Amino acid sequence: MAAEKFETSLKKLEEVVRKLEGGSLSLDDSIKAFEEGVKHAAFCAKKLDEAERKVEVLIKQRDGSFRKEPFTTDNDD
């Protein structure tokens, strides 16, 4: 999964969710699908965290210049 892209993994995760919600899988197949989904969810979460750390916000100063600051959200602790 290392060379996999975020979008590909997200699509696979969505497919797993559809299969599980469909209710037609056996218990064993449901467990396998769940395990696959957990791997894709973890991969996507990691990629999103990496992307968030790369994003910087430009803050305009009073003199018209800009400074970079890390991107933060309201729910950061």
Swiss-Prot record:
<comment type="subunit">
    <text>Heterooligomer composed of large and small subunits.</text>
</comment>
<dbReference type="GO" id="GO:0009318">
    <property type="term" value="C:exodeoxyribonuclease VII complex"/>
</dbReference>
<keyword id="KW-0269">Exonuclease</keyword>
<dbReference type="GO" id="GO:0008855">
    <property type="term" value="F:exodeoxyribonuclease VII activity"/>
</dbReference>
<dbReference type="GO" id="GO:0006308">
    <property type="term" value="P:DNA catabolic process"/>
</dbReference>
<keyword id="KW-0378">Hydrolase</keyword>
<comment type="similarity">
    <text>Belongs to the XseB family.</text>
</comment>
<keyword id="KW-0540">Nuclease</keyword>
<dbReference type="InterPro" id="IPR037004">
    <property type="entry name" value="Exonuc_VII_ssu_sf"/>
</dbReference>
<keyword id="KW-0963">Cytoplasm</keyword>
<comment type="function">
    <text>Bidirectionally degrades single-stranded DNA into large acid-insoluble oligonucleotides, which are then degraded further into small acid-soluble oligonucleotides.</text>
</comment>
<dbReference type="GO" id="GO:0005829">
    <property type="term" value="C:cytosol"/>
</dbReference>
<dbReference type="Pfam" id="PF02609">
    <property type="entry name" value="Exonuc_VII_S"/>
</dbReference>
<protein>
    <recommendedName>
        <fullName>Exodeoxyribonuclease 7 small subunit</fullName>
        <ecNumber>3.1.11.6</ecNumber>
    </recommendedName>
</protein>
<dbReference type="InterPro" id="IPR003761">
    <property type="entry name" value="Exonuc_VII_S"/>
</dbReference>
